[in-house]
Amino acid sequence: MKEDSTMTYLTQKEAQEIDAELMGPKYGYTLAQLMELAGLACAQALHKVYGPERYPRVLVCCGPGNQGGDGLVAARHLWHFGHKPTLYYPKQTDKEHYKSLLRQCETLGIPVIGANFSEAVGETDVILDAIFGFSFHSEPRAPFDEPIRSFQQTQTPIVSVDIPSGWDVETGNPNHVYFTPNVLVSLTAPKRGVKSFPGRHFLGGRFIPPGIVKSYNLKLPCYPSSDQVVEITAVQGEDK
């Protein structure tokens, strides 16, 4: 665990341990609950920066794992916030909860595509990157190598969920091999690899029990009003 005067930055192992403890017998959270809270936070952060008046069309890029589940939840909330999301979801899972999340999007009329990514990028106002999370540790392969390469080249604003796809959770993107999003929404606590992230940075995790904050000695900012996210760009900038 890496700490400074105002913020805790987690390693991959610590992030996994906190998730496991949240879903353990003491706290009783389910994966579905955590996914819902994470997706809501991501949707709220995107909406704050890229409102639907100027950025109505959102291309939500979902991977096959939990990160993709966060994206499915976010797409639904973005629709309710007045955006016009489209799901890029080329590698769907057979897990029942993910099927339910997808069905919820489809009943709202949210388009779902699995190909023609470059065409979809040209028809959107902002991208939500929910492809790979903090457990990913290899070179991106098809069908996700194309969008991650495109992220490096596009001028369309990108919002990434928790860790930008392709980045290492602990070392980040030191050689600038991968794209740097405009906005990052860290979940629970920011990860070590994003400590030097230069863009606008939000934290979503307004559900962490005091017992976990205490046992992991987490240093986290206060959330304003009833918001599910807090901007930590200024706090992070002060720590550089």
Swiss-Prot record:
The keyword Cell inner membrane does not apply. InterPro entries: YjeF_N_dom (IPR004443), YjeF_N_dom_sf (IPR036652), YJEFN_prot_NAXE-like (IPR032976). It comes from the Eukaryota. (6S)-NADPHX binds at N66, Q67, G68, G69, D70, G133, F134, S135, F136, H137, S138, E139, D162. It is found in: Cytoplasm; Mitochondrion. Pfam families: YjeF_N. It is an enzyme of class 5 (isomerase). It catalyses: (6R)-NADHX = (6S)-NADHX; (6R)-NADPHX = (6S)-NADPHX. GO terms for cellular component: mitochondrion. Binds 1 potassium ion per subunit. Keywords: Cytoplasm, Isomerase, Metal-binding, Mitochondrion, NAD, NADP, Nucleotide-binding, Potassium. Residues 15-224 form the YjeF N-terminal domain. GO terms for molecular function: metal ion binding; NAD(P)HX epimerase activity; nucleotide binding. Its cofactor is K(+). Its main location: cytoplasm. Its EC number is 5.1.99.6. K(+) binds at Q67, D129, S165. Gene3D superfamilies: YjeF N-terminal domain. NCBIfam families: yjeF_nterm. Belongs to the NnrE/AIBP family. Catalyzes the epimerization of the S- and R-forms of NAD(P)HX, a damaged form of NAD(P)H that is a result of enzymatic or heat-dependent hydration. This is a prerequisite for the S-specific NAD(P)H-hydrate dehydratase to allow the repair of both epimers of NAD(P)HX. This is NAD(P)H-hydrate epimerase.
